[in-house]
Amino acid sequence: MYRANYVPAAKDPMVYLVSHTWANRFEKGRRRATIEAYSNCDSVLLYNDLTNEKATFLGRKKNNGTGTHFMWENRDIRYNVLRAVGYYKGKPVAEDLILLNGLEQAPNFELLYQDDKKILKGEAGYNYLYRLNCGGDDYTDSFGQLWLQDNTNYSRSWAENFKDLNPYLASQRTTNDPIHGTRDWTLFQHFRFGRHQLEYRFPVADGTYRIELYFTEPWHGTGGSASTDCEGLRIFDVAVNDSVVLDDLDIWAESGHDGVCKKIVYTTAVSYTHLTLPTN
């Protein structure tokens, strides 16, 4: 990775575990394996849990210079969490974490839920017409609320303009990272992305509507440090029926990497049969 080799740790320390897209690597259960990481730090410590306990410590590796990376060979991987901590001048400065399917839950796994903001709980006094799991399937959250599958009944993207293309092509992704601020990771781990041709349309009667929008930044900031700054790297607007309701939204600035971001807007749909939410 470029940053691991050519960005000094003094400027922007980082560590990246290989790989965030290989969650099923241990789907058949516990076994020994080689774990790799990229970092510009002086050394990296590897753990099989959320804490620094000796029982789940997998070893410390030193930085051997440009063109090399960190490797822990023949390690016993027992739990479903791998966590790498990068050290610079003797201090922990960067951290990365991946979740693995098929393994026993890490002893301190519940720490990943400690900042649950319960932001999905429906507001009292409101009748919710739609809840949609953007990019995902039907999902019932921790409050018993059903979020509908994202399908072409509601969403539109660029691929629909081309015959025989999957309508979700290059506008739908998933992440296996834990999501900070909620227990309902699944709802945020499936998502849509795109530019001006991504939109949602919902049939409604005339009236004033309260719209709750939920976001996360799944890419920028992975494996970074407290000094990592991704502000301004992804900025977009959200409109309702051609009127901008969120201008220059920067999810990183709102909630950082893999954090939940909630926005509430109010709009009046007069003489419309749909609420249309495009992004740009």
Question: Where in the sequence are the language-model features?
Answer:
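Compositionally biased, intrinsically disordered or flexible polar/acidic segments
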Residues: 104-280
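Substrate-binding clefts and catalytic carboxylate motifs of secreted carbohydrate-active enzymes
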Residues: 1-118, 122-126
